């Protein structure tokens, strides 16, 4: 889930297009069930139509490969297959699944791209079923068909094998970050040195904006008062991703059940972590880590992030207010 309302990430950019040192090409649209916004500092000789077309092509190809909503997507075909054979996959799909497994190991299983059936079971998935509390027996039964360890990869031949044929893979927690990285790679190859890419809250920024200043991201004050912006984050050659939990939940008997499902228990998490923001050189990496950290909770996240030297910013929900915490690796990126 990407954050809105109390915890909003606002891209602070100049709206003036033309300057004597170039202009900002803005490309907006819809992809992967969300919005995207790309700002590129160009010169007057840039083929803007071609840039837009190439970016739209990249997004379309990723969606056609990794969407679970497109019946004939590459991933949907794998999910529907009950084959006991190894299946060939595209380079992009292999890259994303391979990285997802690495993050699963790094987060001790907290990040898991196979828990879609559990998310659906609790009424938070694409099936749109009624929110209800499943029995222990049903949770145990569904959990048998989950587990990132059941995805085997052949790096030599770019193939995937599901040791459980009922395994269902959902890349929504990592694919947007991958798309951000791939567009950034395209812009780098085209020698663009200044841009900002955002897809569904996943961001990567490089160089300067139209005012010759480093791109800045404003973090809204979670405790609503006259101070709208709590911090301004300076991003250059860095990616940022945020995942959160406070808004998407249901209540039964005065107990709140979060949409964040712990793969280990098959149940919603019960900690007070409302959101986590991760900085990384890769948007795909930040995207997946943010999701995994939301499962771990504040204490384990701070400990693991410090051990791995990952910059993180946490919002923790207390009884009457939101508390912020960030580690020493995140502090240098705060400009106010």
Which positions does each model-derived feature cover?
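Mature catalytic core of soluble alpha/beta enzymes
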Residues: 2-9, 14-336
């Amino acid at each position: 889930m990407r954050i809105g309302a109390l915890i909003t990430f606002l891209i602070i950019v100049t709206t003036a297009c033309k300057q004597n040192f170039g202009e900002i090409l803005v490309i907006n649209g819809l992809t992967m069930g969300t919005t995207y916004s790309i700002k590129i500092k160009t010169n007057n000789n840039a083929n803007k139509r071609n840039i837009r077309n190439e970016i739209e092509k990249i997004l379309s190809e990723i969606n056609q490969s990794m969407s679970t909503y497109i019946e004939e997507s590459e991933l949907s075909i794998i999910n529907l297959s009950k084959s006991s054979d190894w299946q060939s996959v595209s380079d992009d799909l292999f890259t994303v699944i391979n990285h997802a497994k690495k993050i699963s190991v790094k987060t001790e299983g907290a990040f898991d791209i196979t828990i879609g059936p559990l998310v659906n079971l609790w009424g938070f998935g694409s099936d749109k079923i009624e929110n209800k509390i499943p029995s222990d027996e049903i949770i145990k039964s569904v959990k048998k068909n989950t587990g990132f360890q059941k995805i085997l990869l052949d790096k030599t031949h770019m193939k995937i094998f599901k040791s459980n044929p009922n395994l269902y893979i959902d890349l929504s927690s990592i694919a947007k970050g991958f798309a951000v990285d791939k567009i950034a790679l395209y812009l780098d190859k085209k020698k663009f040195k200044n841009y900002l890419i955002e897809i569904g809250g996943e961001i990567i920024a490089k160089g300067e904006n139209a005012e010759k200043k480093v791109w800045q991201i404003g973090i809204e004050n979670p405790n609503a008062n006259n101070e709208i912006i709590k911090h301004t984050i300076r991003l250059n050659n860095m990616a940022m991703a945020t995942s959160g939990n406070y808004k998407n939940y249901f209540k039964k008997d005065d107990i709140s059940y979060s949409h964040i499902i712990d793969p280990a228990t098959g149940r919603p998490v019960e900690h007070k972590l409302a959101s986590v923001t991760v900085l990384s050189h890769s948007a795909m990496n930040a995207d997946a880590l943010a999701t995994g950290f939301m499962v771990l909770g504040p204490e384990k996240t701070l400990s693991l992030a410090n051990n791995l030297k990952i910059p993180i910013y946490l919002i923790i929900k207390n009884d009457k207010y939101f508390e912020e915490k960030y580690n020493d690796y995140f502090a240098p990126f705060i400009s106010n």
